[in-house]
Swiss-Prot record:
GO terms for biological process: formation of cytoplasmic translation initiation complex; translational initiation. One of its GO terms (molecular function) is translation initiation factor activity. Residues 1-10 have a biased composition (Polar residues). Belongs to the eIF-3 subunit B family. Disulfide bonds: none annotated. Keywords: Cytoplasm, Initiation factor, Protein biosynthesis, Repeat, RNA-binding, WD repeat. It comes from Aspergillus fumigatus (strain ATCC MYA-4609 / CBS 101355 / FGSC A1100 / Af293) (Neosartorya fumigata). This is Eukaryotic translation initiation factor 3 subunit B. HAMAP family: eIF3b. The gene is prt1. GO terms for cellular component: cytoplasmic stress granule; eukaryotic 43S preinitiation complex; eukaryotic 48S preinitiation complex; eukaryotic translation initiation factor 3 complex; eukaryotic translation initiation factor 3 complex, eIF3e; eukaryotic translation initiation factor 3 complex, eIF3m; multi-eIF complex. Residues 40-126 form the RRM domain. Residues 1-20, 696-721 are annotated as: Disordered.
């Protein structure tokens, strides 16, 4: 029978001490976790010490602060008293949700309550977790300072002496980064298996390569493409960089479930789909629930939903980011705090889409800083459809345009923000036919005048501005005939402004190419050259390479236009799905991805003029991505000087190209010469040895007679030397006989 406390002897006590067992590992393993309900509690320290009769007054005063970050009440604030009926200087507060408790810690910790008291706010669970005995060392131990390690140069590829460009290639389960070597095979930089699970994506300036995994996103960079940052977003599916690479947006269809012990994600991210990250710190700025878009106008049937992506759109200078709640509002947030501009969203009834200007524009007569945002709303009741331009941060509408009989609208900004083209698809009054007209806003001109291009008779299916230019290309198509097996033909139209002294004239049609199958437009990033192609087609795969500033003779009918159009070459790439220009505008890659079809996957390299340099069939080819370059550091004057001396530079480049070819040819010739010289030297050496042997045996120089050789062999045997005979067997004829 086990002894009771009353009957416990001294011997029993000593035995207990001797047999004491260390249960620390089991305690750690089976430690009872705190109730989930405690994650709504916070502890507020730094409060004034007041008597019991003043406690309620202090609680009411404290609630003014607390209700700015969440919802709580007097009953949810517990302020304990000591034996002298005085408060202890702290209080326990319960919020409605864990997110509100987290917000209280983030926003109220360290803020002043009055001139003499500063609030110290902590989660109750954190105090319980870190305040237990043994969790924190009593003695201060200085942190170990790791030795300095020089970081890799994240833009080292720009220092390539031959000014080559890099590209990423995703095929099978391998991702590689290569140098482009023109006519020669690409030079491998790095090639890794299972580098990504979904896809890879370059950041806008080429600093980082992003890989996407079920655990989140990782950024790679430097000469060896080492890991730079990671962003834990479980089951992430889509990512988007800000224009200056300062921020990253990630999205997953699955709401986030924060696991206990997760170091970066907090309860504030619980249940959200979108996270906006700060790339420099690797920490989330804010998280959101995603909004779906309706796939079409609401009718009797429930409209289909589609993912709104990009969910957030960035201003050119990254000072603002905005998202749209379709049909209701646009919310504009200020960076880096991610607080709502003016603390309210911009209410816009029926809003369908919006786009920021891709560059900071200075309008005539406007001196203050602004970013421009363009949006459109459909016809609602008797109200017409509307396109409007808003100035941020003032939220002032600076230009509006009413539209009628509108089916759809697309907004196309020119890369410098000089124009925004509003592509308006209109239906006839009977709603049986469709046509498109263009409303072009001239942003920098006084009052933002609008030019209308209404000469188009068909529906525009694609539109693209020339980068850093004022010309555009569009593709139109007629209405599909019901039951027809073949899609209607398309027409490609080229537009340019009229010459008007120093000003930019009205936009006019240069030329229309009829009876095409083209459906895609790809401008060179430097302008001037454009590829008009047919992609994602099962029957047509043509690519037309056009020059908008051809240096040859200009047709008489086009002399008033700021362009000289010339088709340089037409080529085909079977099954082509994607076309990508390199960032310098020198090369074009056409590719056929296994993500679209599994027929003759691979990629082809072309010059800007359409000459095919190489064809690269690649099994299980998925992605080809040129590495972007950051904007040039040269001033406009320096760039102008470079263009002025381009012919002189071209001579140097041509000489370098010839030298490189000569070096390659010289290397081949030198190798052949070396092998020939080695052979000649060997022959000379063998002849010298043979002459010495003949001299030793007393044979004449021309003694090659077999009889003399036989006598020489006998002589060598007499002299006691060893003779090695080599027997060579040769099969003259071989037959097989079967004996029955």
């Amino acid at each position: 029978m086990a002894p009771s406390f009353d009957t416990l002897s001294e011997q029993d006590l000593h035995e207990e001490e001797e047999e004491e067992i260390d249960f620390s590992d089991l305690k750690a393993q089976y430690e009872v976790k705190l109730e989930e309900g405690l994650d709504t509690f916070v502890v507020i320290d730094g409060l004034p010490v007041v008597p019991e009769e003043s406690r309620q007054k202090l609680i009411k005063f404290l609630l003014r602060k607390l209700n700015t970050v969440g919802h709580t009440s007097e009953d949810a604030v517990f302020m304990p008293l000591n034996d002298k009926n005085m408060s202890e200087g702290y209080a326990f507060v319960e919020f409605e949700t864990p997110e509100q408790a987290v917000a209280a810690v983030k926003q109220l910790h360290g803020t002043p309550l009055d001139k003499k008291h500063t609030l110290l706010v902590n989660k109750l669970m954190d105090i319980e977790r870190y305040g237990r005995e043994g969790r924190i060392d009593e003695e201060y131990k200085p942190p170990a300072i790791e030795p300095f390690k020089e970081k890799e140069h994240l833009r080292s590829w720009l220092a390539d002496p031959n000014a080559r460009d890099q590209f990423a290639l995703y095929r099978g389960d391998k991702v590689g980064v290569f140098w482009n070597n023109k006519n020669h095979p690409p030079e491998n930089v790095v090639d890794r298996a299972h580098w990504t699970q979904l896809f890879v994506q370059w950041s806008p300036k080429g600093t980082y390569l992003a890989s996407v995994h079920p655990q989140g996103v990782q950024l790679w960079g430097g000469p060896a493409f080492s890991k730079q940052k990671q962003f834990p977003h479980p089951f992430v599916q889509l990512i988007e960089f800000s224009p200056g690479e300062s921020y990253l947006t990630t999205w997953s269809a699955r709401p986030i479930q924060v696991e206990e012990g997760q170091s970066i994600l907090t309860y504030e991210e619980e249940g959200k789909n979108i996270i906006v990250w700060d790339i420099a710190t690797g920490k989330p700025l804010r998280s959101f629930v995603s909004h779906d878009l309706t796939a079409g106008p609401a009718g009797d049937a429930e409209p289909k939903k589609k993912v709104q992506w990009p969910a957030f759109k960035w201003s050119a200078d990254e000072k603002y980011v905005a998202r749209m709640l379709q049909h209701q509002s646009i919310s504009i947030y200020e960076l880096p705090r991610m607080n709502l501009l003016g603390k309210t969203s911009v209410k816009i009834d029926g809003v369908m889409d919006f786009e920021w200007s891709p560059a900071t524009v200075t309008r005539e007569g406007v001196k203050q800083y602004e970013q421009l945002l363009c949006f459109w709303t459909p016809e609602i009741g008797s109200s017409p459809a509307r396109v409007a331009m808003m100035s941020v941060p003032s939220k002032e509408i600076v230009r509006t345009r009413n539209l009628f009989n509108v089916s759809d609208v697309k907004l196309h900004w020119q890369s410098q923000g000089l124009y925004v083209c509003v592509k308006v698809d209109r239906h006839s009054k009977s709603k049986k036919s469709m046509a498109t007209n263009l409303e072009i806003f001239r942003v920098r001109e006084k009052g933002v005048p609008v030019e209308v291009v209404d000469s188009l008779k068909d529906t525009v299916i694609n539109f693209a501005w020339e980068p850093n230019g004022n010309r555009f290309v569009l593709i139109t198509t007629g209405e599909a005939v019901a039951g027809a097996a073949v899609a209607p033909k398309t027409a490609v139209s080229f537009f340019a402004p009229e010459k008007k002294g120093g000003a930019i004239g009205n936009f006019k049609l240069i030329r229309t190419i009829e009876k095409k199958n083209s459906n895609a437009i790809y401008w060179s990033p430097k302008g001037r050259f454009v590829v008009v192609a047919t992609v994602h087609s099962q029957t047509s795969f043509d690519m037309d390479f056009w020059d908008m500033d051809f240096e040859g003779e200009k047709p008489e009918a086009e002399k008033d236009f700021a362009a000289n159009l010339q088709l340089m070459k037409t080529t085909e790439h079977y099954g082509v799905t994607d076309i990508d220009w390199d960032p310098t505008g020198r090369y074009v890659v056409s590719s056929a991805s296994v993500w679209t079809h599994q027929l003759e996957n691979g990629w082809n390299l072309h010059t800007f003029a359409g000459q095919t340099l190489s064809e690269n069939p690649t099994d299980k080819f998925k992605q080809f991505l040129w590495r972007p370059r950051p904007p040039t550091l040269l001033s406009k004057e320096e760039q102008k000087q470079v263009r002025k001396n381009l012919r002189e530079y071209s001579k140097e480049f041509d000489e370098e190209d010839r030298y490189a070819v000569d070096i390659a040819n010289t290397a081949v010739v030198e190798k052949r010469k070396r092998v020939l010289n080695e052979w000649i030297a060997w022959i000379r050496r063998e002849k010298e040895l043979l002459a010495e042997e003949k001299d030793a045996y007393g044979l004449p120089e021309e003694a090659d007679d077999p009889k003399l050789a036989k006598d020489a062999a006998a002589t060598t045997q007499e002299q006691g030397e060893t003779v090695v005979e080599e027997i060579v067997e040769e099969i003259i004829e071989e037959s097989e006989e079967v004996i029955g």
